């Protein structure tokens, strides 16, 4: 069984005439545009350590818990992600992600609250909660995308 040993928290945004190209630019802006993302549910493995640099070759498969949103002219959007690590490094942590086109101020608060609840339900003490978010505003005819992710490898 494979368990990731490293994780990184990222957010980014991108703009294009095409929705998928805007998403690709958001991935590139977040620093994960040259990897093949496999979307996973929201568990951070025990002993998984934060790493500032992704040490994989371009094209590598990388696991990601992420939220994304794409908007058009006149819309606003936000993505947010949070990861809670346990005081006991033998216990797994949790990851929560969300996106919204409405409650832009609440996304980071929401993911933090979900982390707190999930760790409490598991009877785990929280060492720390790390968050990242991306707000976007579409003022032209272009599509704008945002992503917030916890990537693991």
Regions found by a protein language model. Give the residues of each.
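Helix-coil modules at protein/domain termini and other flexible surface or pore-lining loops
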Residues: 1-153
């Amino acid at each position: 069984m494979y368990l990731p040993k490293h994780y990184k928290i990222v957010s980014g945004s991108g703009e294009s005439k095409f929705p998928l190209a805007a998403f690709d630019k958001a991935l590139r802006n977040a620093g994960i545009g040259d990897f093949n993302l496999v979307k996973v549910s929201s568990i951070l493995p025990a002993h998984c350590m934060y790493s500032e640099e992704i040490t994989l070759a371009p094209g590598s498969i990388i696991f990601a818990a992420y939220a994304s949103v794409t908007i058009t002219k006149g819309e606003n959007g936000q993505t947010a992600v949070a990861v809670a690590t346990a005081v006991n490094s033998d216990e797994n942590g949790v990851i929560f992600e969300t996106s919204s086109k409405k409650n832009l101020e609440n996304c980071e608060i929401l993911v933090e609250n979900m982390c707190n609840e999930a760790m409490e339900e598991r009877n785990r003490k929280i060492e720390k909660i790390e968050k990242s978010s991306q707000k976007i505003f579409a003022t032209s005819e272009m599509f704008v995308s945002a992503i917030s992710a916890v990537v693991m490898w």
